[in-house]
């Protein structure tokens, strides 16, 4: 473990939670720098507690460190008090393992999980003393890269990154490290390195593409300016989930993380085709891990880390075709080891008594059902394929098994939504309350139904990308109306300020010009925009005005079905024709079957090189 400098010791003595910045946690990796050829700093643009909850970092950290001559370390966005001390004492941003500044690394990688973390990325580069824009960095600086779901529309942050990874990182990031290693040995300059990196499936080099605009501000084209790079960058995927063993060790945080438990990814992708859900489109095609590998990896992970809770992670865990087998495999050792099982992504339509029994042998965890919309009409519009009868059945099973609290997740501002749909949210919650009291229940034990309502944001690569977003004032009125429809003290309503959703929508569909706005807002004091106490909507409006851009143009304007978008040159697998088809079906409130029952011809199968499912069998 590296020594603490006198300046760092002073800073740590003056901040809350110094454990965020010390490293030395169980499970972290140390190597002899003399034997390391490639050093990578994995940077998460939020606090330690949030970043240490991110499964993607855990997967890639262990995967890269399996290579003897590569060393992956970690850095997080310092909290305000530590940021001030680092600036005062001139301590550059460093990695926790070696305490070396980011400028000592070959690769500095950021995870783009959420649009409102963009200014934190600039803050971290600034703290490290690294020029913000890629054009201002030559081969003497680390290669600045990014990955994550926000790369599906890379353009708002394109000016700040040398390369951006579209798709899944397990193989792509190893190929990047291998290419950087080769470039160091061969003495390539930056342009040579970027060109070689552009050959890797999923790697997007923004500087190799020029953007032109129409007089009305829409994108006219995004085309390569360098011979030999692809017209469209196609995302990288892991074809066989069993080809990469899940992490068998985690860095166990010194400061309590938001999600502090063992976690194994059981599948990737989703069969459901919800029209609002970006993740369900981005992570297609659907791929499963085998029950045996899941169980073996999970057992080793729990024993290595000491965790007594195991989460089975995915977009929809209950859609795994062999979920019962997975639970049987896990329960063969979990109860003996006093490890409880958690299924965070359950579909109410395949929730069963058997699942409850197999996941509550040690202790009960929370129960959340995503109804998404308050009426059947709107659930059909968004292709949720869930009925009230299924919601009632799921809650009935839960109450019969002793649950006395249920969380229901909804969205507000969905396309075609009316006030009747908003009232339906309150009505659904009241029906759940009434159901509880119509059943046998412990004497004196009441029920708590929590409604969590998010503001809908149209996202790229979804059928609703063509839709305009509800205005902030409209969302506020809908929130007030919902509260007026709730009359029971057994129902709790949670929602957040619509201003952050509006800004999220602007960045989600923004073009490359958005980088100037982000940089301007950062220089004017914007960072930690995901935290209510630091977010300033007015500051962002001032940044838009200073850059001569109108935020309304991006999120309050419907896209033409044939419009060139800022993400048209990035291929996530799902075709434009499929998105148009699903959008038109949504306007007619027509549903589409889950793709393991009937292929919807979305196009993602091309990434596998064949069909996603054997339709000669009944997959569900």
What are these regions (language model features)?
Residues 57, 89, 125, 159-164, ...:
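Short secondary-structure boundary/capping segments
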Residues 69-81:
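A short beta-strand-loop structural module common to alpha/beta enzyme folds
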Residues 78-223, 460-511, 519-532:
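Glycine-rich beta-alpha loop elements in corrinoid/cobalamin-binding modules
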Residues 54, 256-292, 601-616:
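Canonical Radical SAM [4Fe-4S] cluster-binding loop centered on the CxxxCxxC motif
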Residues 42-43, 47, 107, 116, ...:
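Conserved SAM/AdoMet-binding glycine-rich loop
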Residues 9-41, 48-49, 206, 212, ...:
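N-terminal [4Fe-4S]-dependent radical SAM core
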Residues 40-46, 64, 251-276, 302, ...:
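N-terminal pre-triad scaffold of radical SAM enzymes
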